[in-house]
């Protein structure tokens, strides 16, 4: 199978959407000898900050001279960036070879990518695999591990409520489902619905460490990573990872951020300039907490260009998003083409914020690199 054929097969899987249950994944992995259970896996769940925790843990392990695989989503620039070993993307032919193993399995898109990840990490002989849950926990297709080495939790908040539940407690219960008997667990500082996690840990006889609060979302994520490294016997402070579309700066005049929920908005505010007018290029998916995001970010903006994401059915139209945005910023225009929206934002010399969606970040980042 060629890389192009592998990507085409994955695109064909997109129409399957999200399907409940782990039976398809377990059956597919069983045909490989359940190689996921031959890996030392740090399994990371949460609503915000999972990618930072994963990257920081991997950084510490690499500096301790371990060979480390990382699985993190969504991708921004290259599809293969979701699966890396020692910071290098899975080679195209290796990707195609792993896809071919599962080509006839009835897997969804994300299930197929996850199966490829576990097989590639096994074939690559990684010392550790740092695996980020895609969504949720108990029902997430990464959750086919009999005995993860450590389970870690980033911040838990409301998101993906149609799939995970409409309360923080329900979401925490779903995410805590990655915990396995006897597995050490690391919790985000003052994690929401902590009793849910503690109850699960007591039931499964799991030792629990709560990271110390640092007072800043990024520092709190690093504290979680630091506790994971300590449990692994690594005496190295985690470095601050630079991740695409996570408060990513392009020069002094543009910030690209894919956060899309109220907690992500609150973290973003800490990185916005207070002494310059801000022009926001904004797109959002219709299933997000639109008002909860906009009410925090847009009062900091002088003007907003609402746009959309071509070919993304879940994206709000530019006009509908502009109507919602006018509640929080008086100067709002709609421009359906995101590239023209960026050009319009640059017209007055303001600080530019591109925000609201990883899909928008993926589209715009092509103009910036």
Model-derived regions: residue spans:
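Short functional linear segments
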Residues: 1-46, 53, 59-66, 71, ...
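Residue-level signal for inorganic ion chemistry
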Residues: 10, 47, 68, 130, ...
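ATP-dependent carboxylate-amine ligase catalytic core
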Residues: 22, 26-37, 63-146, 192-194
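Hydrophobic alpha-helical packing residues
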Residues: 57-62, 121, 325, 368
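Acidic, Mg2+-coordinating active-site environments of NTP-dependent enzymes
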Residues: 125-133, 148-234
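Nucleotide phosphate-binding/pyrophosphate-handling subdomain across enzymes
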Residues: 128-133, 139-152, 157, 213-303
């Amino acid at each position: 199978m060629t890389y192009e054929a592998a990507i085409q097969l994955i695109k064909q899987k997109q129409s399957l959407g999200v399907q409940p249950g782990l039976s398809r994944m377990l059956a597919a992995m069983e045909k490989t000898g359940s190689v996921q259970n031959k890996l030392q896996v740090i399994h990371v769940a949460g609503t915000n900050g999972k990618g930072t925790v994963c990257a920081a843990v991997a950084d510490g392990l690499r500096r301790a001279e371990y060979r480390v695989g990382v699985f993190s989503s969504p991708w921004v620039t290259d599809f293969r960036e979701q699966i890396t070993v020692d910071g290098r993307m899975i080679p195209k032919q290796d990707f195609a070879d792993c896809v071919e193993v599962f080509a006839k399995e009835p897997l969804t898109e994300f299930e197929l990518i996850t199966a490829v990840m576990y097989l590639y990490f096994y074939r690559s002989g990684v010392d550790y695999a740092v695996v980020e849950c895609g969504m949720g926990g108990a029902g997430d297709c990464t959750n086919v591990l009999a005995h993860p080495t450590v389970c870690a939790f980033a911040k838990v908040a409301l998101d993906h409520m149609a799939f995970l539940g409409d309360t923080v407690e329900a979401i925490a219960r779903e995410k805590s489902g990655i915990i396995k008997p006897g597995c050490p667990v690391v919790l985000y500082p003052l994690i929401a619905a902590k009793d849910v996690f503690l109850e699960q840990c007591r039931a499964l006889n799991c030792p629990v460490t709560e990271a110390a609060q640092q007072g800043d979302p990024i520092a709190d994520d690093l504290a979680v990573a630091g506790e994971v490294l300590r449990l692994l016997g690594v005496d190295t402070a985690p470095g601050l990872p630079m991740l695409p579309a996570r408060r990513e700066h392009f020069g002094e005049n543009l910030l690209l951020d894919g956060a899309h929920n109220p907690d992500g908005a609150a973290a973003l505010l800490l990185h916005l300039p207070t002494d310059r007018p801000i022009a926001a290029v904004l797109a959002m998916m219709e299933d997000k907490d639109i008002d909860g995001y906009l009410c925090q970010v847009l009062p900091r903006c002088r003007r907003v260009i609402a746009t959309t994401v071509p070919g993304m059915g879940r994206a709000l139209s530019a006009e509908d998003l502009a109507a919602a945005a006018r509640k929080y910023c008086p100067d709002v225009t709609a421009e359906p083409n995101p590239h023209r929206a960026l050009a319009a934002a640059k017209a007055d010399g303001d600080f530019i914020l591109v925000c609201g969606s990883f899909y928008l970040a993926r589209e715009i980042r092509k103009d910036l690199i």
